[in-house]
């Protein structure tokens, strides 16, 4: 039996990347569940681990893009082959931030702010826009090694210059859909979660690593590759350790050197930045990016190493399936959390609203939702091998979505027509509903004050969980003059 760990047989399959992507997707479920339900303060160590999910996912995307784009005969994979998938993922990305999947949510239950949320840059948008840039770069260069070096330099440059694009006021002249690509400064109530500066750097570094892997493990030299898989893994861990140490050494002082000066308005600035801006930029600097990238490399190397020793563990095959069905798991777990469990009717009925659980309750949610997604990924992976059945299920799913689009959420509209005081979004019909009830119109149609909200709540017999009620009242108080 051939030892694929130590042999030098050329290979285009890097298992540690699949394992890393699968693990990142599973931890992502924990991140969202914890942020939604845990009532306490998330420990710093868990916050740090959670902060490695997106860098891992983005790096893997760049790595896979290089291997799939540059063929063994030095040709490039046709862009027409990948464009439909890129388009589908981008469509899913924007639909996840759309006002909803029902006609009522796009019409009577829509608000200007809900439409602005459509342009929020999340991780899927970041992945696709980054890959489109790298695809264009690959087709301009058309040489894998030069592409790899260029991606490396580009990644360093993006991370280096990112803080300068996060200065307050930058990009105010840009339209909302474009501005979020550059920084995460809030604009008209919309904050980009994964702007290209600095998150594109992780995809670029992944592409550079993919070029190195192809050169060392895919290219044939005297009937074998330059390196074995084990050599590549050891180098990966070593590089990860070095850049992690450098990031640790530099991150606390990277932007904090120089002389503080006071401007004409009495605001202290260091190299043009205020203290608040410097604290906000802590995770947007080159050392911070390199620190997290180092951890990603080391974790990936560790997964590859244990996979070589315990290859038969079912956990690895499960992670591989999750990696292959990562888009399904990403969308499904968001719909379970935000579309079902946090749906007002469900959360009010169960008491499972925001910040409503202790450690054990949160853990139960995490385990159950991960379990559901693992089963769904495994089943869909099997179904994909049966094209006719897959197409039939896709047609049935689209039919259900169409019915939901036509009939969904009209009951919500009718509910707020009768009780506009309980609305927490400024729907355009609320003031007309208030006038019909003999109430004084307000600037946005919502409750005049907390007392009015509570009075209608008692009249309707509504009982909200404490955390949910607190959040609704904060919205009412926050908009009062």
Where are these regions (language model features)?
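Alpha-helical transmembrane segments and their immediate juxtamembrane cytosolic regions
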Residues: 2-481
């Amino acid at each position: 039996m051939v030892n694929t760990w130590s042999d030098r047989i050329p290979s285009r399959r890097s298992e540690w990347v699949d394992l890393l992507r699968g693990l990142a997707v599973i931890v992502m479920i924990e991140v969202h569940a914890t942020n939604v339900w845990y009532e306490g303060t998330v420990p710093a160590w868990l916050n740090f681990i959670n902060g490695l999910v997106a860098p891992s996912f983005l790096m893997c995307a760049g790595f896979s893009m290089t291997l799939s784009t540059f063929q063994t005969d030095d040709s490039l994979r046709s862009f027409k082959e990948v464009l439909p998938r890129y388009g589908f993922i981008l469509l899913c990305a924007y639909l996840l931030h759309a006002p909803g999947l029902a006609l009522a949510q796009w019409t009577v239950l829509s608000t200007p702010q809900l439409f602005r949320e459509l342009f929020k840059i999340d991780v899927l948008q970041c992945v696709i826009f980054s890959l489109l840039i790298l695809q264009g770069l690959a087709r301009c260069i058309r040489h894998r090694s030069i592409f790899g070096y260029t991606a490396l330099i580009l990644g360093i440059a993006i991370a280096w210059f990112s803080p300068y694009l996060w200065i307050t006021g930058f990009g105010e002249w840009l339209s909302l859909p474009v501005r979020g690509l550059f920084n995460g400064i809030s604009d008209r109530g919309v904050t980009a979660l994964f702007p290209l500066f600095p998150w594109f750097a992780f995809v670029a570094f992944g592409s550079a690593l993919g070029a190195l892997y192809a050169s060392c493990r895919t290219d044939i030299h005297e009937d074998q590759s330059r390196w074995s898989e084990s050599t590549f893994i050891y180098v990966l861990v070593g590089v990860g350790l070095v850049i992690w140490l450098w990031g640790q050494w530099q991150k606390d002082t990277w932007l904090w050197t120089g002389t503080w000066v006071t401007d004409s308005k009495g605001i202290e600035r260091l190299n043009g930045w205020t203290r608040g801006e410097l604290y906000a930029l802590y995770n947007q600097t080159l050392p911070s990016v390199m620190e997290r990238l180092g951890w990603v490399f080391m974790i990936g190397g560790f997964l590859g190493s244990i996979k070589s020793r315990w290859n038969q563990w079912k956990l690895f095959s499960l992670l591989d399936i999750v990696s292959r069905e990562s888009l399904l798991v990403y969308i499904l777990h968001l719909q379970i959390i935000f579309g079902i469990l946090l749906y007002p009717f469900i959360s009010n009925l169960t008491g499972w609203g925001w910040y409503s659980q202790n450690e054990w309750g949160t853990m139960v949610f995490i385990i159950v939702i991960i379990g559901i997604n693992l089963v769904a990924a495994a089943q869909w992976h099997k179904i994909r091998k049966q094209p006719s059945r897959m197409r039939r299920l896709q047609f049935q799913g689209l039919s259900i979505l169409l019915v939901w689009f036509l009939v969904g959420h009209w009951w919500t509209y009718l509910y707020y027509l009768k009780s506009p005081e309980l609305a927490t979004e400024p729907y355009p019909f609320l003031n007309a509903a208030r006038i019909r009830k003999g109430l004084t119109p307000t600037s946005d149609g919502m409750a005049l004050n907390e007392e009015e909200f509570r009075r209608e709540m008692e009249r309707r017999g509504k009982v909200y969980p404490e955390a949910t009620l607190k959040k609704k009242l904060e919205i009412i108080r926050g908009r009062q003059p």
